[in-house]
From Swiss-Prot:
Gene3D superfamilies given in the database record: 3.40.1280.10, tRNA(m1g37)methyltransferase, domain 2
Enzyme class: transferase
Encoding gene, per UniProt annotation: trmD
GO function terms (MF aspect): tRNA (guanine(37)-N1)-methyltransferase activity
Enzyme Commission number, as recorded: 2.1.1.228
Classification via HAMAP family: TrmD (MF_00605)
Protein name: tRNA (guanine-N(1)-)-methyltransferase
Subunit-structure text: Homodimer.
One Pfam family of this chain: tRNA_m1G_MT
InterPro entries found in the cross-reference section: Alpha/beta_knot_MTases, tRNA_m1G_MeTrfase_C_sf, tRNA_m1G_MeTrfase_TrmD, tRNA_m1G_MTases_N, tRNA_MeTrfase_TRMD/TRM10
Main location: cytoplasm
Length: 242
């Protein structure tokens, strides 16, 4: 998968390219990431990338010309089919379903805003979709972009090694994940549930599913509203409640 990022702080994306799951994906050629800095497209000695908004008000906006030229350069390098995404509080909220939609694209260009944002006409003419990671304010689009990259890359074939690793993540089936345990069997008088030590794979599967359903009910009941539970899931959830 090819990823382009338009950002004033390309150094931040070393966290993606040099570490963890995404770093291994880049090293193994499963993920290609390139950055474009609007400062490199300025024409003044100060490399100015901000400008005053029409109508006044506090703060500055990203200057149109350097930002637009950076986006055009990213498009030229990544391909005309690349989907351009602007990370924005006004965008569609990123969910696992959204991640599954985005991973179907061969290439994405992520535009990271700074200051008070970007000119609305850039959004109208250059951006295909706006995405948000939540209803709160950040200093820029870099952290949301890294969040999106990390979540999407986990679904790229070969990145996690085992397909089941992604399938068992929280939200992969619309539910929160079940509890997990490792050694020792007893920690501060708390024991690993006996079913996980039984070796009975069917019992373990049902226990994990029931715990996943129960945890979702207790912590994120809103998720259950959008799910059509199977007969087995309904039975296990009823048993959990009882």
């Amino acid at each position: 998968m090819r990823l382009g990022v338009v950002t004033l702080f390309p150094e931040m994306f070393r966290a993606v390219t040099d570490f963890g799951v995404t770093g291994r994906a880049v090293k193994n050629g499963l993920l290609e990431l390139q950055t474009w800095n609007p400062r490199d497209f300025t024409h003044d000695k100060h490399k100015t990338v901000d400008d005053r908004p029409y109508g006044g008000g506090p703060g500055m906006l990203m200057m149109v010309q350097p930002l637009r030229d950076a986006i055009h350069a990213a498009k030229a390098a990544t391909g005309d089919s690349a989907k351009v995404i602007y990370l924005s509080p006004q965008g569609r909220k990123l969910t696992q379903q959204g991640v599954e939609e985005l991973v179907k694209s061969d290439s994405l260009i992520l535009v990271c805003g700074r200051y008070e944002g970007i000119d609305e006409r850039i959004i109208q003419t250059e951006v295909d979709e706006e995405w948000s990671i939540g209803d709160y304010v950040l200093s820029g689009g870099e952290l949301p972009a890294m969040t999106l990259i990390d979540s999407v890359s986990r679904l790229v074939p070969g990145v996690l090694g085992k397909k089941a690793s992604a399938e068992q993540d929280s939200f992969s089936d619309g539910l929160l994940d079940c509890p997990h345990y490792t050694r020792p069997e007893t920690l501060d008088n708390l024991d690993v549930p006996a079913v996980l030590l039984s070796g009975n794979h069917e019992h373990i599967r049902r226990w994990r599913l029931q715990q996943s359903l129960g945890r979702t009910l207790l912590r994120r009941p809103d998720l259950l509203e959008n799910l059509a539970l199977t007969d087995e899931q309904t039975k296990l959830l009823n048993e959990f409640v009882e």
